[in-house]
């Protein structure tokens, strides 16, 4: 059981979740795009949210700036979060268009706001769970897409909510976070997504 729960730490790693969100979006809205557009956007997301952050991690570790694999120390989170924020900004500014892919545009804008908020909290001496931030933002994005396209993803949403609990349990089991840090990470992930609903989702309902 412990191995099963701990697996969710890796399945829903913060670097992987934006790729899951992109895949989910194009599974729902693929008929509105050409295949080459889907491949191009997915490739850009994969490079900027997984490959480059992993490369930076190994660079910082080789330079002695990072010691642990899971960034338990608050100071170790500063550079990765700042770098990830820049990559998200590049992705938003050059890969998406608010007129062409508004749903993904606002999802990643929400992720950027959450990442900057997590960085601000670290600078203020507080730590939030990046895992909970990622999975909660994805869950809210799924709810938004369900409402926007009038498609009932009740089972998927229920599964994601259950996964939120399993991710939280895995982080507690690993003694990586306190309950307060998990709750803070969840709020940091949820609030920007809900706030941006007022821009792209609610006007269309």
What are the roles of these predicted feature ranges?
Residues 1-6:
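Short, Lys/Arg-rich, polar N-terminal cytosolic tail immediately upstream
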Residues 8-29:
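The first (N-terminal) embedded transmembrane alpha-helix
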Residues 27-40:
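Short, hydrophobic transmembrane alpha-helix segments
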Residues 37-52:
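Alpha-helical transmembrane segments
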Residues 51-64:
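Membrane-water interface of transmembrane alpha-helices
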Residues 68-84:
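Juxtamembrane helix-capping/reentrant segments at transmembrane boundaries
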Residues 81-100, 122-124:
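C-terminal halves and exits of single transmembrane alpha-helices
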Residues 105, 109-205:
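Membrane-embedded catalytic cores of phosphoryl/pyrophosphoryl-handling enzymes
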């Amino acid at each position: 059981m412990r191995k099963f729960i701990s697996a969710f730490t890796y399945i829903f790693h913060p670097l992987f979740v934006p790729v899951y969100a992109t895949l989910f979006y194009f599974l729902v809205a693929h008929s509105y795009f050409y295949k080459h557009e889907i491949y191009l956007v997915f490739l850009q997301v994969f490079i900027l949210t997984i490959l480059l952050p992993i490369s930076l991690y190994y660079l910082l570790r080789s330079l002695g700036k990072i010691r642990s694999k899971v960034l338990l120390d608050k100071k170790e989170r500063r550079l990765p979060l700042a770098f990830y924020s820049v990559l998200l900004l590049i992705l938003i500014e050059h890969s998406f268009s608010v007129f062409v892919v508004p749903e993904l545009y606002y999802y990643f804008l929400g992720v950027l706001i959450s990442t900057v908020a997590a960085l601000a909290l670290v600078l203020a001496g507080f730590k939030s769970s990046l895992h909970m931030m990622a999975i909660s933002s994805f869950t809210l994005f799924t709810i938004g897409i369900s409402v926007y396209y009038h498609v009932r993803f009740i089972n998927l949403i229920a599964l994601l909510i259950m996964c939120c609990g399993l991710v939280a349990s895995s982080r507690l089991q690993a003694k990586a976070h306190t309950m307060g840090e998990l709750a803070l990470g969840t709020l940091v992930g949820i609030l920007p997504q809900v706030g941006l609903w007022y821009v792209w989702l609610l006007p269309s309902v």
